[in-house]
């Protein structure tokens, strides 16, 4: 992994995206459905692309929106459709395009009051609250966001009535219908003008912000945070939660400083990520240099990505806490401080999350539910309360309300951030200090994720790796105990491989949203062992994708 000379430094002018050119390309570019890279493709979190590459243009948005209307009709989903969008430059035009199709199809659309930017968790929360107690007329939702991806990116997610990311069978249906519409030059897409859509009887306004903020007391112990007057800092990274944080501070009377309230779709205020891209990733020490530099001003600080479904935790004692480490801390704390959760509520993790989570679950006597990458695999369990917590290595998590009922079934960056404040106030230690106590008791993991460029063809080869392609019986000096191509929790394909020994493991898989592949590795022995794990994994992956 080659680190850019710009990494961790303020974004220079030459890296800033030309917003007028980008938006012009959104409207003028016409994708060719015969070219695979220009088709609609739902990854682990929706369809993403860039107008410059003909992978996220108005045609894509029109086609996906019509496909969703047809899916709703086929499934008998006829309640309101909650719509949110983030602060990326392409999100507002895409939201306008989507509304023109949704209104033409007679869908009751719930737009944010005052055209407020809306975080992903606020949409999931709204769907769940609306559908509670209903068996018909169910709501669903759309979020226009490419998450933490660079400023030139656009994205489109669909959340069905369970409030979580759409399952694979849903996205495949929508994807196929959208590509059919693209191939037919949008014949079959219903559309009215934006002015007509805004005035339509089916277009409504919804107060996402205050509904979400007022309900937080039912998932986080706000009294505990306020009672010790913690000094809290938050950097929304120019994202959709910019005004949510000030509302939270005011509503709950918290000593919370929003260190950056700027919204700028070039994201010029960011420090550059590892590869020379501007990427609003709250789990990256390169992208988070701004808040890390302020760590000593606060008892605990946090950040979220543009749609606020990911979190980053910064402490004065440890700086930026690695996502896996904070997941383990959160699980250990929550299951011992939520007495009204079901006694059989399980711990949800993905195959690339830390083995420390397994050890924490064992210590607190909770069942582990291990699934492929993708938060959609946690949605049903969070919905029915059989999962107390679901978390991903990429810093996405959600958990139940204090009474054990569902809060959100999509990733929520705000509640893990506020949980860091809750645990600091109640335990008198920040999350980094709590983590060190965990590792003293259970062992310290050394982990790394290596990202490398890969073409779509190479990603396809990697995704088809099978256990019989691993002929070695040893990995980094230890006997191989297990080779997985399917997750043990739900027996779903992981889209790659996970190879495990007594004190280490690696997993290799292609990214579902970017042209990269990822190797995850972890050792409970030390850095040298970790390095050996990565080297041997790299040999296997390079051999697979060079075929």
Q: How would you describe each model-predicted region?
A:
Residues 58-62, 122, 505-507:
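Metallocofactor- and cofactor-centric catalytic cores in central/energy metabolism, strongly enriched
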Residues 429-547:
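Catalytic-core signal marking the mid-to-C-terminal active-site face
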Residues 2-13, 76-164:
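Ferredoxin-reductase
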Residues 84, 141-147, 303-305, 390, ...:
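Short beta-strand segments
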Residues 13-14, 21, 25-28, 109-125, ...:
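Phosphate-binding chemistry for phosphorylated carbohydrates and sugar-nucleotides
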Residues 34-44, 189-193, 259-266, 512-513:
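Flexible hinge/switch segments at interdomain interfaces of large molecular machines
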Residues 2-104, 199-232, 240:
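An N-terminal, well-structured beta->alpha segment
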